[in-house]
Amino acid sequence: MLQPIGDRVIVKVKDEEEEKVGGIVLASNAKEKPQMGEIIAVGNGKRNANGDLIPMSVAKGETVFFDKYSGTNLKYEGEKYLVLRESDLLAVVK
């Protein structure tokens, strides 16, 4: 299992579904990168200037939105993930 370090989270990006516009199937390179996913692992948090640990404000299992250009793509055991810093997250679906 993957465990992120510091203020990072590992997100399983929602699968891209083929999109049809007016009956035309869009090519995969015409689609934008998904911006929504489920958190599968959360780091311990970030340390401030005094060395105190600031805990993460998100949790495993939450669905989040993120900027389409943020994070690092990662492939592990045949699955695709995205590693993001907590500050890259835009919103949590409640």
From Swiss-Prot:
Keywords: Chaperone, Cytoplasm
Compartments where found: Cytoplasm
Annotated SUPFAM superfamilies: GroES-like
GO molecular function: ATP binding; metal ion binding; protein folding chaperone; protein-folding chaperone binding; unfolded protein binding
GO cellular component assignments: cytoplasm
Pfam families: Cpn10
Source species, domain of life: Bacteria
GO biological processes: chaperone cofactor-dependent protein refolding
SMART domains: Cpn10
Binding partners and assembly: Heptamer of 7 subunits arranged in a ring. Interacts with the chaperonin GroEL.
Purpose of the protein: Together with the chaperonin GroEL, plays an essential role in assisting protein folding. The GroEL-GroES system forms a nano-cage that allows encapsulation of the non-native substrate proteins and provides a physical environment optimized to promote and accelerate protein folding. GroES binds to the apical surface of the GroEL ring, thereby capping the opening of the GroEL channel.
Similarity field: Belongs to the GroES chaperonin family.
NCBIfam families to which the protein is assigned, alphabetical: PRK00364.2-2, PRK00364.2-4, PRK00364.2-5
Protein name, per record: Co-chaperonin GroES
Gene: groES
